Structures are given as C-alpha cells and as structure tokens.
C-alpha cells in the first residue's frame, strides 16, 4: 500500500476531536480540538486542516450503541461523514468509536478534554486494521 496521510474526526455537536496519522508509520496522534457549535466555523477549520495536511482519506468515528446498533448519535456521525465527502470530495471511512473516550481518559489520566485523543484512538484502530 502506498503511503497515505489520514485525518480522523471524533464528531460532537459542540467539539470535534482531530487526529493525524499515516500508513507508513501506522501511528496516529492527537492534533487538535475544534470548539464550535456553528457549522460554518467548524467546516472552515476543517477546510483549513484538509488544505494544510492534504489527507488521501479521512476517518470518522461512528457512535454506535453498546450492542453495536444505531442510536441518535450514529445518524449525526453518518451525516457529518457525508458532509465531509460532499463538501470536500474526500474519501471517508467510518470506524466504530465505542470505548474511545474512556480509553482516551485512561491515557490522559485526567479529566482534560479528550476529544483529540479519542480521534487518535479511532484512527489507530483503523490503521491497525490495515496492517
């Protein structure tokens, strides 16, 4: 597989965690948290990130219920993924995000904002599947 840069998003209505990684190192790391409830501000920042990093594809965490089924947040994540594809023409992969926030809190060892770390965990899961 050729080397690819990937961005990942842990979508929330008030915050979006962002992580970056690539297929050469198969390593993901937290990048930033987008704090905004306004759609235009969120997508403006996402556009800037896409222009700066030029990912070949993006990964979006899919908020499934504990039993693996859909819940209201699942639809919001799918809608966000569709918006990314529609607005920016980027390939989008969905990855089960169950437990990523708890794992992020464990890694951080605090109650600090964990959205970017959760995005890194989601992206790492995707990269591990590719390996």
Swiss-Prot record:
Record-linked Gene3D superfamilies: YqgF/RNase H-like domain (3.30.420.140)
Keyword set, alphabetical order: Cytoplasm, Hydrolase, Nuclease, Ribosome biogenesis
GO cellular component, one term: cytosol
GO biological process: rRNA 5'-end processing
SMART domains: YqgFc
Enzyme class: hydrolase
Gene Ontology molecular-function annotations: nuclease activity
Subcellular location: Cytoplasm
E.C. designation(s): 3.1.-.-
Stated role: Could be a nuclease involved in processing of the 5'-end of pre-16S rRNA.
Name of the featured protein: Putative pre-16S rRNA nuclease
UniProt source species: Bordetella avium (strain 197N)
Lineage: Bacteria, Pseudomonadati, Pseudomonadota, Betaproteobacteria, Burkholderiales
């Amino acid at each position: 597989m050729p080397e690819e840069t990937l961005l990942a998003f842990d979508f929330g209505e008030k915050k979006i965690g962002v992580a970056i990684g690539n297929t050469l190192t198969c390593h993901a790391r937290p990048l930033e948290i987008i704090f905004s409830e306004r759609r235009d501000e969120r997508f403006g920042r996402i556009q800037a990130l896409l222009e700066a990093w030029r990912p070949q594809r993006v990964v979006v965490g899919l908020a499934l219920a504990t039993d693996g089924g859909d819940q209201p947040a699942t639809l919001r994540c799918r809608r966000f993924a569709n918006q990314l594809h529609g607005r920016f023409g980027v390939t989008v992969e969905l990855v089960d995000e169950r437990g990523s926030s708890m794992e992020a809190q464990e890694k951080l060892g605090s109650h600090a904002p964990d959205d970017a770390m959760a995005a890194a965990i989601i992206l790492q899961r995707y990269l591990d599947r590719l390996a």
